[in-house]
Amino acid sequence: MNIKNSVIFTKKELLYFCIQRFAFGFSYSFMIPIIPLFFNSLGLSTLVIGRVMSLHGVGKALTQMPSGVVSDKIGDKLLLIISYGLLSCMPFSYTFASSKVMACIIYIIQGALLGISAPATFSVLSRSLDENKRGESTGYASAVFTLGGAVGALIGGFIVTKLGNYNFAFYLSSVGIVLSIIFVAIKIKKPETKVRKSNKSKDSQGSSIKDVIKTKKYNKFAPKIILLGAIAFLGDFIYGCIVSIFPFYGQEVLGASAFYTCIIISVYLFVFGVFAPVGGWSSDKIGVKKQLFLSFIVMNSSLFLLSFIRGIIVFTIIIIVYFLGATFLNSALQNSLLKFGDKPEIKSIVFGFVGACESLGYAVSPIVSSFVYELNKRYLFGMLLVSSLIVFITFLILYKKAFSLKLS
């Protein structure tokens, strides 16, 4: 893969998309490793933190489907600016949170706003990528967001664990999101089809669900949509478990420091960022189906080992291997999902559905993982292994039907 001839340098729209995603990922991720610690500092128990993070995910899931319709109506760029604008207020709001209840409400609203931004983000990406290098394009898009997130999470964790200053991290997050909004407003183009579609808005809106049902019935896209939804669910389920519970697991089970747990979350994002383009490129070369299968094998093997290993050095090596497997799985997922961008009559519904599944995984994960953690702290990664195996079995059942037809 020649970097100089890479699609990110040959397609301007994709470059601008990647810049804004890096900026947003960097800014937003100041909060990711410190939110559980922030809630804990307010006196919330692990179980309550899990429930709050679950409601955050519920809010994110509930807003995605309707936001897909809104994105079609007002344009993805405008919806992205509005959602980012509201999100920029969230980190700043934590500095005024005078009670546990207020902090929890802010976090739940934050989840709903993330859900609003998701369909618009997918829509902008689907019209910014190179059709001939779809996997590579989505790989770079994922990479810049998670690379920015890795750096942001590391800085946020350092500020809190070493300086003990939550407010400073929240201020930086808000300012960074505002800068992302400015870039989106200046550099991201409006969708070209907006005016043409508005002439038949009633017809398109009224037939969207009907078109999806018809597509499922006659073109057999349902297995692919269900499979993509299941994989998206798994990805955010495991990510949500690690973000919400690992800060406690690392200290209480592995005997590591709080800063180590922040580093692991940052490494999670860093691995995604560095290897997502490779994963996207390889999914173009070997095919999505084969890459999904190999990724599941790596993930399941790693989770099996992580379920009983307690030594920090070996644990760190194996969890990085797991991160690699998850990265390649996500790259294949994004490659397959964004092919629905060629189906304008159903793309927003499909993006919204898969995004809602992803958010549902994040919603369920904290409450499930906190329950398992309270039951037995050592069961955490065993539970993640069982979850991954269930989705892997779903893949084995559906993959023939899911990949039997082409979208374009």
Where are these regions (language model features)?
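Structural signature of the two symmetry-related core transmembrane helices
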Residues: 78-92, 290-305
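Cytoplasmic helix-loop-helix junction between adjacent transmembrane helices
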Residues: 108-145
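Intracellular juxtamembrane helix-capping segments at the cytosolic ends
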Residues: 116-129, 328-342
